[in-house]
């Protein structure tokens, strides 16, 4: 997950702006990503519905990073948004669950969330995986950029660890009921 961020950190840190394109549940994960990247990295972020992005003439520059998020890696609107952003010279970072799908093949780099198949309409595993990747992206870039102190970085990591333990305890308690 982090290798794509570390391998392309110079390009990611050089971004004047991030634009996140997604649909459905992935769009909701993108809203959290916007908050994290802006708060931790101090880089402006726009979140766009891929279905709207593709039908207008978005202002995209070569120093923009476009993050494309899709559980399936085959969302037609997100694929079209990627192609449009590539034509305008943006660097494309994909976040996807499906290994070998179209989105990872056409982006410059990216991360898989590896959460397995989603059963049902509510895409809870994919949402959690997407937010996790966006969190790691924001934390890694903030640390590299120096926009977050080491103390704050460690505090956030400790808080995230505590969330995992709290979830596990709640799960164990619910199993006992």
Model-derived regions, located:
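Conserved small/polar residues in nucleotide/adenosyl-binding loops
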Residues: 166-173
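Cationic, low-complexity basic patches in intrinsically disordered or flexible, solvent-exposed regions
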Residues: 176
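Glycine-rich phosphate-binding loops that contact phosphosugars or nucleotide phosphates
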Residues: 13-162
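An N-terminal, well-structured beta->alpha segment
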Residues: 1-16
């Amino acid at each position: 997950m982090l290798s794509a961020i570390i391998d392309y950190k110079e390009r990611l840190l050089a971004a004047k702006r991030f634009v996140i394109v997604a649909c459905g549940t992935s769009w909701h994960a993108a809203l959290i990503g916007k908050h994290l990247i802006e708060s931790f990295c101090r880089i402006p972020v726009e979140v766009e519905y891929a279905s709207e992005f593709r039908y207008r003439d978005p202002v995209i520059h070569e120093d923009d990073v476009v993050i494309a998020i899709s559980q399936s890696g085959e969302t037609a609107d997100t694929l079209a948004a990627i192609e449009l952003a590539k034509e305008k010279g943006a660097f494309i970072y994909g976040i996807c669950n499906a290994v070998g799908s179209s989105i990872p093949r056409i982006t410059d780099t990216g991360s898989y969330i590896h959460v397995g198949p989603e059963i049902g309409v509510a895409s809870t595993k994919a949402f959690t995986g997407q937010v996790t990747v966006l969190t790691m992206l924001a934390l890694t870039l903030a640390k590299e950029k120096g926009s977050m102190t080491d103390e704050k970085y460690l505090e956030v990591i400790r808080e995230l660890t505590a969330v995992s333990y709290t979830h596990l305890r709640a799960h164990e308690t619910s199993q006992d009921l």
